[in-house]
Amino acid sequence: MSEKNYEFIDIKRIEPETKSLNVRKVDFSEIYEQTNIKKVSEQASRCLGCGNPYCEWKCPLHNYIPDWLKLIEENRLEEAADLCHETNAFPEICGRICPQEKLCEGACTLNTGYEAVTIGQVEKYISDTALEQGWKPKKYSEKQTKFHVSIIGAGPAGIACAETLIRRGINCTVYDKYSEIGGLLTYGIPVFKLE
């Protein structure tokens, strides 16, 4: 048997570090500290690579979670970012506000006795670091169709819809009654949760 099958025993789940209470009392920015590739790669290495990945099944977007965990374990950040973005218009947001403990992490096989892989932390690291390094999604169609779609509402659903259509070569115009896009992401989620 491969050594990979037992890393989850030796490497314990480590929650993301939070800023001190003294800092958080006067600062309403994001509460989690930045992490690094070593910590994230170590947590990603805990993934068993299940034959039937319940984490992927339980994710509403059916993200390729075991695949991008493997890529991060191998320090292949840009490929992991491409894969994250293939199924998700907002991986940088889902890594922060998605209730992973009820979805992907809640379905992780390791929950039975060993604690789940920190999937949300890894997803946040992948998208944040890739964006900081200038990464841009590569999945847009070079062939434009003759179609044009108008989308009412520039919230998460409207933006995700536009992004999906643009990937398929369909031009979009998004309309919203507010001056800034984002809907709930902009007007409903506090900055300490989504900066």
Functional labels for PLM-detected ranges:
Residues 171-174, 178-195:
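Rossmann-like dinucleotide-binding cores of NAD(P)H-dependent redox enzymes
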Residues 1-148:
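Ferredoxin-type iron-sulfur electron-transfer modules and their immediate structural context
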Residues 89, 155-156, 180:
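Residue-level detector of alpha-helix initiation sites
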Residues 53, 155-157, 184-185, 190:
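Gly/Ser/Thr-rich beta-alpha loop segments that engage phosphate groups in nucleotides
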